[in-house]
């Protein structure tokens, strides 16, 4: 039974050596913004649709984008690194100890405004000052008179990633520019930039381009950047693979550019969480491939990762220490003195740590296929827990991708699923699960929403399945249904689809907003923004008349229902029955009760819910059919089932 799983947190102090931490993989991310500073990037784009909005330049919008992303990461991903590199500036700065370069490696016209590191409150405030303070921006955002070498920019980024994030699994370089051909007249510099881009790719850094088109010129990536940007391999699930889209500034102000950049970056900034890596998927004896598992869908909730002490001048993280103390003597108990016992027959039976481990050991982590069943045999109510998405990994066994793809396509073609024995990691409780094939899902822009792969859906235990209570619903009449259909049609969401990205969790966002204000030493917000509140004015405008018509129809149908009910009471008194008639009436009631009890027992027998009947009803039924009514409830149920089986 799923509810009977023991609490592993209570045993954590005695199983520290045995817990397999490699089963959960957290991918830290390092993002470096490379924003070009040029005359065109500093020119504010006019907004003909809004006269009140202040025009903003693409460079300012990109800096705002970096600022907002830094705000988000300081709360949601506190271990990720973010940096801002300005190139094409008149002044140069690489590190604080050397304004013009680092040792013998000069990077002219490259200004490292924010070093690649975990963002602190001072970094966020400094970047915000650059965006809002015009004097500060006029001091730094000065375009150089001579062109900057893209090879130097990429080599500078290479040095930053190598120095600050050498072991990060995800490293990305965001280039924001409106120049689609920076070295149109110099093939040597273009070739050097291509070589530096290849070096970044070999280092594991993914270059992402945010091209900005102008009203007079569309950004053409084929002139220069197609040779620099390497797309990720489709067989690598942890390598980002995004389509490059152009962001036009024509007819839009800096806020529109910012929103466009933020939506594109937010789709890339979701951290990858691997529940397990290189887990064997056993298709048969001595036939295994390796897969990795990801939890794609999960409800987010505020989680405490540590305790913070706010009593001093600065907040400090509390280091917790667990100490076990004996109740009788209050002395500290050593780890080797601890024994765990279970109560059997009124006595406590103690087990050693080795015996405890042997009891919980169900074998090595594995996904073992037991058999195959048609998808029609998997009911929708069998989904009781979060499903795990699995994808092939070549790290464990070479050729896993080909075998995995063949299995997935075959299951899709034959409309079947695999029944598997699933042990996620060491010391984990095994479960019977359904291995369901999944197709790739794309949105209207042909962007991938759900990747192709397979899903592990844990199946419920027998004790998890409950019998639904009997409900007698009143079906609404057709006129009332027709009126409600009109209301639903006018209130339908765009394209009839719910987009969770448009409705963030208000309580979670409020929690993050408070933490952000505390971390950045800002004023606490007065009110939370809740996008889940219905738009009552818009609802009334669209469906107000239809709702009133539905209410009138509801009253009409209610009157018809009340008028159709039979009269169940009268004012006339009945004469007192004679003793003979009273005896006959009692006999009639007894016969009716027995017949009603038989019908009820038969109904529960057909539904398989005899255990819902009381012992009294079961005994009366058995005695009325000359059967024994002694024994426990289970024995009575068995006799009732045997009685109906013989019929």
From Swiss-Prot:
GO biological process, one term: telomere maintenance
Residue spans of biased composition, Acidic residues class: 11-21
CDD domains: KU70, vWA_ku
Composition-biased stretches (Basic and acidic residues): 1-10, 579-598
Subunit structure: Heterodimer of Ku70 and Ku80.
Catalytic reactions on record: ATP + H2O = ADP + phosphate + H(+)
Database matches in PANTHER family: KU AUTOANTIGEN DNA HELICASE (PTHR12604), X-RAY REPAIR CROSS-COMPLEMENTING PROTEIN 6 (PTHR12604:SF2)
Residue span(s) of domain SAP: 610-644
Compartmental location: Nucleus; Chromosome, Telomere
GO molecular function, one term: telomeric DNA binding
Entry keyword annotation includes Nucleus: yes
Family: Belongs to the ku70 family.
EC nos: 3.6.4.12
Main location: nucleus
Protein name, per record: ATP-dependent DNA helicase II subunit 1
Gene behind the chain: KU70
Role: Single-stranded DNA-dependent ATP-dependent helicase. Involved in non-homologous end joining (NHEJ) DNA double strand break repair. DNA-binding is sequence-independent but has a high affinity to nicks in double-stranded DNA and to the ends of duplex DNA. Binds to naturally occurring chromosomal ends, and therefore provides chromosomal end protection. Required also for telomere recombination to repair telomeric ends in the absence of telomerase. KU70, of the KU70/KU80 heterodimer, binds to the stem loop of TLC1, the RNA component of telomerase. Involved in telomere maintenance.
GO cellular component term of the entry, any: chromosome, telomeric region
Span of domain Ku: 282-472
Enzyme class: hydrolase
């Amino acid at each position: 039974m799923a509810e009977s799983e023991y609490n592993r947190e209570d045993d954590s102090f005695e199983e520290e050596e045995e817990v397999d931490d490699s089963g959960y993989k957290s991918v830290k991310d390092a993002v470096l913004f490379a924003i070009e500073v040029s005359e065109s990037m500093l020119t504010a784009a006019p907004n003909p649709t809004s006269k009140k909005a202040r025009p903003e330049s693409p460079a300012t919008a990109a800096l705002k984008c970096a600022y907002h992303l830094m705000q988000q990461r300081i709360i949601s991903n506190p271990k990720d690194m973010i940096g801002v590199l300005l190139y094409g500036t008149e002044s140069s700065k690489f590190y604080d100890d050397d304004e013009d370069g680092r040792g013998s490696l000069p990077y002219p016209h490259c200004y490292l405004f924010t070093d690649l590191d975990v963002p602190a409150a001072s970094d966020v405030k400094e970047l915000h000052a650059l965006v809002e303070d015009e004097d500060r921006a006029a001091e730094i955002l000065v375009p150089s008179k001579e062109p900057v070498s893209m090879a130097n920019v990429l080599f500078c980024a290479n040095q930053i990633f190598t120095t600050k994030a050498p072991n990060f699994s995800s490293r990305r370089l965001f280039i924001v520019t409106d120049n689609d051909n920076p070295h149109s007249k110099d093939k040597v510099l273009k070739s050097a930039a291509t070589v530096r881009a290849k070096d970044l790719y070999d280092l594991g850094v993914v270059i992402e381009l945010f091209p900005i088109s102008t009203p007079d010129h569309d950004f053409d990536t084929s002139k220069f950047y197609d040779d620099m940007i390497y797309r990720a391999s489709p067989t690598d699930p942890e390598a980002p693979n995004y389509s490059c889209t152009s962001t036009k500034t024509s007819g839009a102000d800096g806020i529109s550019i910012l929103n466009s950049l933020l939506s594109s970056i937010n789709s890339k900034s979701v951290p990858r969480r691997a529940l397990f890596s290189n887990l064997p998927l056993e298709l048969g004896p001595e036939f295994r491939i390796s897969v990795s598992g990801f939890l794609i869908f999960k409800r987010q909730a505020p989680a405490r990762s540590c305790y913070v002490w706010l009593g001093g001048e600065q907040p400090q993280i509390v280091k917790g220490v667990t100490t076990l103390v004996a109740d009788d003597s209050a002395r500290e108990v050593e780890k080797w003195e601890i024994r765990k016992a279970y109560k059997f027959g009124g006595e406590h039976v103690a087990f050693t740590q080795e015996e405890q481990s042997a009891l919980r050991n169900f074998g090595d982590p594995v996904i073992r296929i037991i058999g195959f069943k048609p998808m029609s045999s998997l009911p929708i109510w069998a989904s009781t827990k979060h499903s795990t998405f699995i994808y092939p990994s070549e790290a464990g066994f070479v050729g896993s991708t080909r075998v995995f793809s063949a299995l997935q396509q075959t299951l899709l073609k034959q409309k079947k699923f695999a029944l598997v024995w699933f042990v996620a990691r060491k010391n984990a409780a095994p479960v019977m699960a359904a291995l369901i094939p999944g197709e790739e899902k794309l949105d209207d822009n042909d962007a991938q929403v759900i990747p192709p792969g397979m899903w592990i859906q844990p199946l419920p235990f027998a004790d998890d399945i409950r019998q639904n209570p009997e409900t007698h619903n009143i079906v609404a009449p057709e006129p009332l249904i027709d009126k409600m259909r009109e209301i639903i049609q006018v209130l339908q969401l765009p394209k009839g689809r719910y987009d969770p990205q448009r409705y963030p969790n208000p309580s979670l966002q409020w929690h993050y907003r408070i933490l952000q204000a505390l971390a950045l030493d800002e004023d606490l917000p007065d009110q939370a923004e809740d996008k889940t509140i219905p738009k009552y004015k818009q609802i009334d405008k669209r469906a107000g008349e239809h709702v009133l018509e539905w209410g009138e129809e509801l009253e009409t149908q209610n009157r018809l229902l009340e008028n159709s009910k039979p009269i169940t009471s009268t004012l006339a008194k009945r004469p007192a029955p004679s003793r003979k008639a009273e005896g006959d009436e009692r006999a009639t009631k007894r016969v009716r009760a027995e017949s009603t009890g038989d019908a009820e027992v038969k109904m529960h027998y057909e539904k398989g819910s005899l255990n819902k009947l009381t012992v009294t009803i079961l005994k009366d039924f058995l005695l009325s059919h000359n059967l024994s009514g002694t024994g426990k409830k289970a024995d009575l149920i068995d006799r009732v089932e045997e009685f109906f089986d013989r019929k």
